[in-house]
Amino acid sequence: MAKAQVGPGAPPLPTHLQLEVTSACNLACAMCLVSYRPAINRAEGAMPMELFRRLVDGTPELARLTLQGLGEPLLQPHLLEMVAYVKARGIAVGFNSNAMLLTRERADRLVAVGLDWLHISLDGATAATYEGIRSRADFDRVAHNLRGLQEAKRAVGAATPAIQVVFVAMRRNLHELPDLVRMVSGWGVDEVHVQGLSHDFADTDPAGAYAGIRRFASAESLERVDPDLVSDVFARARDEADRVGVRLRLPAHQPTPVRREPSQPGCSWPWDAAYITSSGVVQPCCMVMGDDRVAMGDLGEADLADIWRGQAYADFRAALSSDTPPAVCAGCSLYRRTF
């Protein structure tokens, strides 16, 4: 195993932070951990502005900030203030959204404050498929709100936020991908990012809490679908994207062996980025999710710099640089190259 580097031997502070600005969500999506945990209300789920400022100000080389976790960012009451705070410091900032709360007024404000990117989750080309995956969502409202965001940009001649549609590909919605590419191109969207399920959750299961999402991932993962069928749908989606002028990003649908040089990690996250929950728990990346699975430290007890240079991070980096990665990484779609 690679030597654990603590203190001055640790890597420089991260250039990218992903902050869960709220853990509250207005939807309950079939593939999301939110659907398998107790409900979290808006007040309990919000990251305090004081913690947000402390993180931004305490990470001097920060170049990119993603305001995204298990919750819906538009439920964070200080979201616009957060975006303005980092834009004033020259930091690129954006987030993912289900767009249910993206009214025209909110769209106008996000454009005005200089949001760099906004990724809209849309996992179907029909209301039946989409609403079957995202409980409490409304397909027509999302379509209306996405078009409203495009209009808000046109109204002031703004190039940002860059808009991307994110499609989480599963057994139940794969067949609609070519139609989705064609549909969103008609709304002025020029980029679609297709992702696989984020994790198989097979590595750890505290008190049985992850049994439900583990069963879902096992049944719905593209790894369990006929590879020829997946390849055919991807090829048709690619042809459609070429025809309508949409940039299409497709994942591998079968795991790719992690090829690396000795002592080189299979993933760079713990060296250049960190994920922080709304309550201040520091985790090695955004794919870990539940803070009972892996935690590097708590910002209520130490600063990010001390946690970053601490023993827990050093041991995690050393394991990730070895032939036996941390158990939580083994089932991760980023590590397996299927995300």
Please give the residue ranges for each predicted region.
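Residues that line or immediately flank small-molecule/substrate-binding pockets and catalytic motifs
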Residues: 36, 69, 122, 196, ...
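N-terminal pre-core extensions flanking Radical SAM catalytic domains
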Residues: 1-40, 57-60, 242, 253-262, ...
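Conserved alpha-helical substructure of the radical SAM core
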Residues: 1-117, 128, 132, 140-141, ...
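Residue-level recognition of alpha-helix termini/interfacial anchor residues
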Residues: 78, 105-109, 173-176, 226, ...
